[in-house]
Amino acid sequence: NFSYAIDDDDENQVTVDVLKNFNLTIEKGSFVAILGHNGSGKSTTAKLINGINIAQSGEVIVDGQKVVDDETIFDIRRKVGMVFQNPDNQIVSSIVEEDVAFGVENLGVEPEEIRKRVDNALKTVGMYEYRLKAPNKLSGGQKQRVAVAGIIAMKPMCIVLDEPTAMLDPSGRKEVLSTIKKLNKEDGITIVLITHYMDEAVQADRVVVMDGGEIKLDDTPQNVFSKFDEVKSLGLDVPQSTELIHRLGLKSENTILNADDCVEFLKKTLEAKV
């Protein structure tokens, strides 16, 4: 439970609460999507988890450690990796494998172990064959996967991704989301995904909806998007399939979240009317 505020006007020292009495527990190994319109506090939450920002009241605890000062920040950032929106802002080397190795080298890891970690990380995200390429020759989706590989190589327990697909085309978005899901399901890495895309959010185990620095909804994708009017009132969309079923005035036992379920439901509905 914590709060965070900023000075909106330096001259008059106007303080604006970004997060108020914020209480969020994320289970190890889970996949949580955080939704909210611009200014709702999503990115601030991400930076508090990683220790980029420090809570002004209350506590942020990661794996039993309080995120409070320089004594714990280093350990916290080893455990919680971050991937940001623009992949170009995260590239620090002219060779892919050197870029992935950058963070690990700063941890003081032995060269032989660095080599092993870099290779494994690139294989995990499907970018091993590009290890000797220049990052500026890659697509946006490939660059973002390289950024994820750099985090994986540091062996974090959690990865926070702040709108990692916002600047990517549909193909790039699909690549990155597939990688995220693989890391969660196969490697057990906790994923916190901040996104504007509902089709990404529905693939999480849990969806948290924020507004005005507060949590308004916190449940499974099924239960969150079943609250159609409430989600809309918070300035958010719902998955396209959910929207279609609602506009058709149809009622389903379970909330329809994706195209496959939508097709199956419509097929059964039409057959029942014949």
Question: Residue locations for each model-derived region?
Answer:
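Conserved ABC ATPase signature
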Residues: 134-138, 142
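The feature captures the beta-strand-to-loop junction immediately N-terminal to the Walker
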Residues: 35-37
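Conserved ABC ATPase "signature" region
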Residues: 112-129
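Helix-to-loop junction immediately C-terminal to a conserved catalytic motif
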Residues: 50
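Conserved ABC transporter NBD signature motif
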Residues: 58-68, 76
